[in-house]
Design a protein with these regions (language model features):
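Aspartate-rich (DDxxD/NDxxD/DxxxD) Mg2+/diphosphate-binding motifs
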Residues: 20-67
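Intramembrane alpha-helical segments
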Residues: 47-143
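Short helix-coil transition/hinge motifs at the ends and kinks of transmembrane helices
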Residues: 37-42, 82-89, 142-153
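Membrane-embedded alpha-helical segments that form the functional core of polytopic membrane enzymes
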Residues: 1-23, 91-100, 149-172
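Acidic-enriched, low-complexity/disordered segments with a strong bias for Aspartate over Glutamate
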Residues: 25-28, 34-35, 109, 147, ...
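Residue-level detector of solvent-exposed, low-hydrophobicity positions
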Residues: 8, 33-36, 40, 113, ...
Length: 173
């Protein structure tokens, strides 16, 4: 067990959440989706930080970019610690690539998964298997030492399903 890795994983996950929310607010603003929402509630319409003037669109975009770059930086550092190479071929590299795609592609151009009926699936994947399996891989590293045959990925995948469903249901409302 490594407390350093725990804090890095937690920090990366928090930055990923900030990046996802900020990019969602920014792209929903640029598409006018949040502006045309006349019945915004805690369950729809984003955080409304742009609409009520708490932040400018540029500030929200900078928040998203700094957060996603921080997430990527932490992920690459962890990957280097595990594999010996920044871009070493590990599950962390691939979950990081998928997570970045989901975070920015949720409402970001040109993908806009949330506008094409794939928003709930993207959220379930991002908060379920991507985060849970990534964290599990890093935090159980001393037990498998980067040997995929020893990594209990099925256990992590099963543990991610309830989380994926619960987080997905937040936006289902």
């Amino acid at each position: 067990w490594s407390w350093n890795m725990f804090w890095l994983v937690l920090g990366g996950a928090c930055l990923a959440q900030i990046a996802t929310n900020a990019s969602n607010d920014y792209f929903d603003h640029t598409s006018s989706a949040d502006e045309i929402n006349k019945v915004a509630s805690p369950f729809n319409g984003g955080s409304r930080v742009i609409q009520v003037g708490l932040m400018t669109p540029g500030q929200v975009l900078i928040t998203a970019l700094v957060s996603i770059l921080g997430t990527i930086g932490i992920g690459l550092y962890i990957n280097q610690q595990i594999s010996g190479y920044i871009f070493g071929n590990t599950p962390i590299l691939w979950t990081g690539i998928l997570g970045t795609f989901l975070a920015l592609g949720y409402t970001g151009d040109p993908v806009r998964l949330g506008y094409k009926g794939f928003g709930e699936i993207a959220i379930a994947l991002g908060f379920g298997p991507v985060m849970v399996m990534g964290a599990h891989y890093v935090l159980t590293f001393p037990m498998h030492n980067n040997d995929l045959a020893l990594w209990n990925w099925a256990e992590a995948l099963l543990a991610s399903i309830p989380i994926a469903l619960l987080v997905m249901l937040i936006v289902w409302i």
